[in-house]
Amino acid sequence: MNPPKSAPDAQGLSYRDAGVDIDAGDALVDKIKPFAKKTLRDGVLGGIGGFGALFEVPKKYREPVLVSGTDGVGTKLKLAFHLNKHDTVGQDLVAMSVNDILVQGAEPLFFLDYFACGKLDVETAATVVKGIATGCELAGCALIGGETAEMPGMYPDGEYDLAGFAVGAVEKSKIIDGSAIAEGDVVLGLASSGIHSNGFSLVRKIIERANPDLSADFHGRSLADALMAPTRIYVKPLLALMEKIAVKGMAHITGGGLVENIPRVLRDGLTAELDQRAWPLPPLFQWLQQHGGVADAEMHRVFNCGIGMAVIVSAADADEALRQLTEAGEQVWKIGTVRASREGEAQTVVV
């Protein structure tokens, strides 16, 4: 059977006519290879571009357990589009996953990213991936692969979405699951760099209501830069701490804030009582609360309120842990203690 003949005046269609530019995709791969190369570490087998990425678990592990995490950047991307600022969201993407797997004691080994858009802008995508590589360097993990999906009609021009995937390893005997947490333990709070990557739907609503000048000075930088500050990556100082001190539990303070994330590592019958006077509420959160009329309780369940990671140790280890983390460059406060829960009480209370 012969194929149907084209009409004499019909023009042949190409993938580019359909909105997908293969040449742009190839150009992006060439641009990002040097960024990925800077993240290489022991265990990486092969380079970018294969069907699958290969990684050999380091031989230092006797009984390695793999720990995986995946996340995105949420509606912080909407603010990035509005500001045309794409250099920090890549670090946000890495931080959200590596900080999550870190809380179980895992050393991040490698990271993969997914970049989806309607029309690929090579420069914008390369800027995002450069930020991803920066995040991987800060976390000590390798950027070993990813996917760039150009899907015409799926996203408005100038917009994209991101997803990240991190895999780490922890010695089976050293998994941190919160089971050792007991009454009298101390909750340390490590400072956040800002809003991080959660609560931006509320942030954007507050901006809509307040209509501020985002380019105006805000404590030494623009308000836009304060809002877009990349999520802090806690991997290296906390891995070093775990080598010296028995860390009983950790909580990455993401969506749900302090009051919904700390309970994820507490056994039934235990409550973390946090003293909100123990650490300063950063000016950016004060600005959000003031301009949005946000209640204290809502602030604590939406935003990190200045604490990006909670670390639980015994009272005997608290001072030494605080000293080590401070020497490593972290701002740290004793923000609370663990005690027996009272009837009907939440597992984390802020007083």
UniProtKB/Swiss-Prot annotation:
Pfam families: AIRS, AIRS_C
Pathway: Purine metabolism; IMP biosynthesis via de novo pathway; 5-amino-1-(5-phospho-D-ribosyl)imidazole from N(2)-formyl-N(1)-(5-phospho-D-ribosyl)glycinamide: step 2/2
Catalytic activity of the protein: 2-formamido-N(1)-(5-O-phospho-beta-D-ribosyl)acetamidine + ATP = 5-amino-1-(5-phospho-beta-D-ribosyl)imidazole + ADP + phosphate + H(+)
Keywords: ATP-binding, Cytoplasm, Ligase, Nucleotide-binding, Purine biosynthesis
EC number(s) on file: 6.3.3.1
GO biological process, one term: 'de novo' IMP biosynthetic process
Keyword Manganese: no
GO molecular function per UniProt: ATP binding; phosphoribosylamine-glycine ligase activity; phosphoribosylformylglycinamidine cyclo-ligase activity
Domain of life per record: Bacteria
Family recorded in the similarity comment: Belongs to the AIR synthase family.
Protein name from the UniProt record: Phosphoribosylformylglycinamidine cyclo-ligase
Natural source organism: Burkholderia thailandensis (strain ATCC 700388 / DSM 13276 / CCUG 48851 / CIP 106301 / E264)
